[in-house]
Amino acid sequence: MAGEASDLTPGRRSCPLPAIRRSARQLRWPSVPMAKRRSISLRCSKENVGPVRCAVRLREGEASFAEFDLPRKSQQAIMPLDKLGIADALSLKITEIGFENHVPSVWSAGVPFLLIPVHDVGAAQRVEFDPQLWEKIVPFVDGALASAYVYCRGGVNHVAKFHARMFASGMGIVEDPATGAAAAALSGAIRHFDRLTDGHHPIMIEQGLEMGRPSFIHLHIDVDGGAISNARIGGQAVRLASGTLDL
């Protein structure tokens, strides 16, 4: 691993979205090349949600891995939700919405998401998102249209504890393959509905399989006194292409 050091650098956007609305890979991607260029494995990035501590693991011949602390803990926004309308917007039966004691709910760790539990992986794979129906039933949270984060327990891959899909018509995104902000929001729902005991809880979330762009988000939740004391998300970053932009 590269020598330990620290760095405070303003985050750089890689897409035309507000800086707060970024996925795990959009924080991982700048962090990994910066770490390689500067030979550091620990840096702090200035984001709109606050300073974000990011640790990077660099190993020759392996995909680089980046992990960062959540600057904000996930909080629930209590509001009435139209379960039938949600099912219609996802092209699912109302009986396919929810599993165990998980029900649709709104959570945010800086970006609001309407988290929608579905019965199983098959139901998640059958989702056909209708943005027009969604915009009719989805609530506004902090002045923003909540995005849809569909999740279920288990996964296609045996290492995954949850399978997820994210749709954000309000941001011009049909579907996203790896959404760190949504995984951050999900941490609160998991602690709430699964009643996590005190201790450390590592959780693997698979996303993007339906798009042919499989991603694995590592979510770590530390619980103390029945509440989240700390949470981290991370994953691997693989260079697929590179280029330069002249301004």
Regions of interest found by a model, annotated:
Residues 1-18, 23-247:
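Active-site proximal loop and beta-alpha junction motif in alpha/beta enzyme cores
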